Amino acid sequence: MNKISRIIITPGEPAGIGFDLVVLISQKIWRSELVICCDPDILVKRAKDHGIKLKLHFYNKNLSPKVREKGELTIIPIKVNSNVTRGILNINNSYYVINTLTRACLGCINKEFSALVTGPVHKGIIKDSGIKFIGHTEFLAGFSLCKNPVMMLMYNSLRIALATNHIPIKDISKCINFNLIRKKLIVIFNSLRNIFKINNPCIYVCGLNPHAGESGHIGTEEINIIQPAISSLKYLPCKIIGPISADSIFQQKYLKDADAILAMYHDQGLPMIKYIGFRKSVNITLGLPFIRTSVDHGTALNIKNLNEISSKSMEKAISLAIDISQDNSIKK
């Protein structure tokens, strides 16, 4: 029997649907103790909005982890700085969001928690407050001193990783270099073996330019950077194939063999997974010293009808975090 683990969850932007997702997932009995790092008053209010009775237990690290009953959650209370109105951003609560992430990250680093699951944040409002914030991936990597984080979204057996994350299109070609591609591929390889238990993985790599550069006629990054980086990893017990044009790589003839695909930038890789698995896929950060999964969607500030809120992505993110933390094999 697997030992019960503790999973810490940050709901994210308080004006968004993160708190609603937590309320909805409380209606299941999980295999781990879920610890929610948030403002308890907002959580209780959202539960009332949904007509759900919620019982909160204050977190005590000296007690053994315990699976909670339906409608019960463990909580680490962190208060918001200002009033919260559903759907309306409040710049004063940006530090609250960072405070919850900081507490959760510290707890994972010191092994207090087995994994972190994050709800959606609003990057813009955090930046507007003066905080240097690019995204969850970059924040968690910086906080944990991880030099080579890899953002990956996955839906069933489709896993799409990114060479670059949240940067403007005009800057992407400047960021793509031999060491970057090589290091990202090594992190992906190690994660496929250690997390997903795939001993001899197959990784496909997208080109940067249309038609993967067309033999250097539409850009030379494929010839000068991507191919040499792939060739330098021939010693690894895996297949790394590419660069392949991004308009071809998502054909079934490639996908059927791919354990992961490395896209060069955010909007090259993620439209495919958002198309086939939106609200049912999971974001996972590879390379961190702890497990971190997340929902595949944003804050959904414009949702008025509570019945439109789906917790499927959050449920999948939690299930994946539990599977990994309890060292279950996650098979293709």
Swiss-Prot record:
Subcellular location: Cytoplasm
Pfam families referenced in this protein's UniProt entry, alphabetically: PdxA (PF04166)
Molecular function (Gene Ontology), one example: cobalt ion binding
Cofactor note text: Binds 1 divalent metal cation per subunit. Can use ions such as Zn(2+), Mg(2+) or Co(2+).
List of residues binding a divalent metal cation: 166, 211, 266
Catalytic reactions of this protein: 4-(phosphooxy)-L-threonine + NAD(+) = 3-amino-2-oxopropyl phosphate + CO2 + NADH
UniProt cross-references to InterPro entries, sorted A to Z: PdxA, PdxA_fam
Superkingdom as given in the UniProt entry: Bacteria
UniProt EC number: 1.1.1.262
GO CC terms, sorted: cytoplasm
Keyword check for Transmembrane: no
Cofactor requirement: Zn(2+); Mg(2+); Co(2+)
GO annotation terms (biological process): pyridoxal phosphate biosynthetic process; pyridoxine biosynthetic process
Gene3D superfamilies tied to this protein: Isopropylmalate Dehydrogenase (3.40.718.10)
Keywords: Cobalt, Cytoplasm, Magnesium, Metal-binding, NAD, NADP, Oxidoreductase, Pyridoxine biosynthesis, Zinc
Metabolic or biological pathway, per its Swiss-Prot or TrEMBL entry: Cofactor biosynthesis; pyridoxine 5'-phosphate biosynthesis; pyridoxine 5'-phosphate from D-erythrose 4-phosphate: step 4/5
Binding site for substrate: 136-137, 274, 283, 292
Quaternary structure, from the entry: Homodimer.
PANTHER family in UniProt: 4-HYDROXYTHREONINE-4-PHOSPHATE DEHYDROGENASE
Other facts noted in the record for this chain: The active site is located at the dimer interface.
Family label: Belongs to the PdxA family.
Functional summary from the UniProt entry: Catalyzes the NAD(P)-dependent oxidation of 4-(phosphooxy)-L-threonine (HTP) into 2-amino-3-oxo-4-(phosphooxy)butyric acid which spontaneously decarboxylates to form 3-amino-2-oxopropyl phosphate (AHAP).
Protein name: 4-hydroxythreonine-4-phosphate dehydrogenase
Native species: Wigglesworthia glossinidia brevipalpis
Organism taxonomic ancestry: Bacteria, Pseudomonadati, Pseudomonadota, Gammaproteobacteria, Enterobacterales
This protein's encoding gene: pdxA
